[in-house]
From Swiss-Prot:
The modification Phosphothreonine is found at residues 65, 254. Residues 1-19 form the signal peptide. Ca(2+) 5 binds at residues 242, 244, 246, 248, 253. It comes from Mus musculus (Mouse). The modification Phosphoserine is found at residues 69, 261, 277. Belongs to the CREC family. One of its GO terms (molecular function) is calcium ion binding. Keywords: Acetylation, Calcium, Endoplasmic reticulum, Glycoprotein, Golgi apparatus, Membrane, Metal-binding, Phosphoprotein, Repeat, Sarcoplasmic reticulum, Secreted, Signal. Glycans are attached at residue 131. Ca(2+) 2 binds at residues 117, 119, 121, 128. Its main location: endoplasmic reticulum. The modification Phosphotyrosine is found at residue 47. Involved in regulation of vitamin K-dependent carboxylation of multiple N-terminal glutamate residues. Seems to inhibit gamma-carboxylase GGCX. Binds 7 calcium ions with a low affinity. This is Calumenin.
Length: 315
């Protein structure tokens, strides 16, 4: 096995290698927390800072003077105002908050983009992705590595075609993001459900029964008793997952399980920020209204810590 094959196998095996038989595998795609801080504006605005900027970027604003914070906040506002009409709406603010919280996704896409846009034309074709990902292992397969690369490639191609909205087999940056992180896009959620069901549905009848459901998240270790969480999951399946009580989950029931429609924290925070900053109560914010409430959005220190501090200038 050459180095490329080894690295590919390593990446595929990592999740399995780190798992223990009694550990629970979580199939549910959770929305990330906006902040791990308590949301109490009467004490401080730390939660709002984390939500608006992302936790790491919020730390960099703590190093700035009020004047510097206002200047950088003004630049951010221009980016939030998508339609450039001079106002920031709840929807635009919600979109920004979601972007700030999911910046790691964009960083992952940028990293992978460089390795797959082989001709550097600002697009990634299916052929480029296939050659970069599967070229070596398909040309010289190792029968002992335990992976069916042709099957994996077929599955990747199906997902790529789903992400590729115009059907030209060439992905833009946005389409490539949908391919790599389909759970983040509404139009990709069916493929997330389909792939999940294919993984779990061992008898290929198009449903997930109780034993398949438990078998996916728990590997029985010899004669050991089942952990309590496994018993709880059995109860969850019967009481909540299998909504029509037919002993198995269909596509809709599986979708409700792995892609729950939880409370939208980003929208709640966006509405809160608009409510607190909207001086003329027209339901949207101007740059001036946002900068006037800079302490709510980004905060700052009252003093300049000097040149010794390393400041991040992503914005």
């Amino acid at each position: 096995m050459d180095l490329r094959q080894f690295l590919m196998c390593l990446s595929l095996c990592t999740a399995f290698a780190l798992s223990k038989p009694t550990e629970k595998k979580d199939r549910v795609h959770h929305e990330p927390q906006l902040s791990d801080k308590v949301h109490n504006d009467a004490q401080n605005f730390d939660y709002d800072h984390d939500a608006f900027l992302g936790a790491e970027e919020a730390k960099s604003f703590d190093q700035l003077t009020p004047e510097e914070s206002k200047e950088r906040l003004g630049k951010i506002v221009s980016k939030i105002d998508d339609d450039k009409d001079g106002f920031v709406t709840v929807d635009e603010l919600k979109g920004w908050i979601k972007f700030a919280q999911k910046r790691w996704i964009h960083e992952d896409v940028e990293r992978q983009w460089k390795g797959h846009d082989l001709n550097e034309d600002g697009l990634v074709s299916w052929e480029e992705y296939k050659n970069a990902t599967y070229g070596y292992v398909l040309d010289d397969p190792d029968p002992d590595d335990g992976f069916n690369y042709k099957q994996m490639m077929v599955r990747d191609e199906r997902r790529f075609k789903m992400a590729d909205k115009d059907g030209d087999l060439i992905a833009t940056k946005e389409e490539f993001t949908a391919f790599l992180h389909p759970e983040e896009y509404d139009y990709m959620k069916d493929i997330v459900v389909q792939e999940t069901m294919e993984d779990i549905d061992k008898n290929a009848d198009g449903f997930i029964d109780l034993e398949e459901y438990i078998g996916d998240m728990y590997s029985h270790d010899g004669n050991a008793d089942e952990p309590e969480w496994v018993k709880t999951e059995r109860e969850q399946f019967v009481e909540f997952r299998d909504k029509n009580r037919d002993g198995k989950m269909d596509k809709e029931e599986t979708k409700d399980w792995i892609l729950p429609s939880d409370y939208d924290h980003a929208e709640a925070e966006a509405r809160h920020l608009v409510y607190e900053s909207d001086q003329n109560k027209d339901g949207k914010l101007t740059k001036e209204e946002i900068v006037d409430k800079y302490d709510l959005f980004v905060g700052s220190q009252a003093t300049d810590f000097g040149e010794a501090l390393v400041r991040h200038d992503e914005f």
